[in-house]
């Protein structure tokens, strides 16, 4: 309905709406579980307008307020996303935004006690992959995962003006992960924006969607 009211005829893909631990499932499409107070709900959705796709993710607290643990994880993801967007500059290569998210998420998980060990070793061994198991983004255009190489002659492709990509880091703590404190289990958070590369710097085309915890709580309190 919201897509149609805004002038779009079709969704760009099947929406992902994962409440509670279902937010830890990357492509959860059943979208049928009851939302419960105290849970988060992860919404990954976008419409197709004039043959171009959008792909946006936000994570909301079901009852309008983040718990302390949810906010702590959310803020790590947001810090990683903002830094990755800053890395979406002409002349940087495709992997730089992703590597930025890896470094910040690893440091954040260490600070929260979810990961333990030496920071450099954890990054090198990919220990973060238990909680962040996907790339930071993909090309976006007339298809959600649009065509285009990520490497050319085995070298990461350099970002150029006019390119559009998603930036979507996340942290997903399985409810079955008994290596972490129970207070963290079942938290799944992703924040995704659509970014246009321009000579003067990245443009966030989905910037109107609130994404700080303060703005999200204010939005929900206003409904």
Question: In which residue ranges do the predicted regions lie?
Answer:
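Active-site neighborhoods and metal-handling regions in enzymes and metal-associated proteins
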Residues: 1-223
């Amino acid at each position: 309905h919201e897509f149609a009211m805004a002038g779009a005829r079709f969704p760009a893909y099947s929406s992902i709406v994962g409440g509670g631990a279902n937010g830890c499932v990357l492509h959860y499409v059943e979208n049928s579980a009851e939302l419960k107070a105290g849970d988060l709900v992860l919404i990954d959705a976008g419409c197709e307008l004039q043959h171009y796709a959008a792909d946006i993710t936000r994570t909301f607290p079901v009852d309008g307020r983040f718990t302390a643990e949810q906010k702590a994880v959310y803020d790590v993801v947001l810090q990683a996303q903002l830094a990755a967007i800053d890395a979406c500059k002409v002349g940087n290569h495709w992997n730089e935004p992703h590597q930025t998210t890896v470094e910040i998420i690893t440091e954040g998980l260490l600070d929260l006690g979810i990961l333990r060990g030496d920071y450099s070793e954890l990054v090198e061994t990919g220990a973060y992959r238990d909680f962040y198991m996907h790339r930071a983004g993909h090309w976006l255009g007339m298809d959600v995962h649009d065509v285009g190489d990520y490497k050319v002659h085995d070298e990461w492709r350099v970002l150029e003006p006019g390119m559009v990509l998603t930036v979507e880091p996340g942290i997903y703590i399985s409810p079955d992960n008994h290596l972490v404190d129970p207070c963290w289990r079942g938290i799944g958070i992703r924040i995704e924006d659509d970014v246009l590369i321009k000579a003067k710097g990245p443009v966030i085309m989905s910037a109107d969607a609130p994404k700080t915890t303060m703005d999200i709580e204010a939005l929900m309190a206003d409904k």
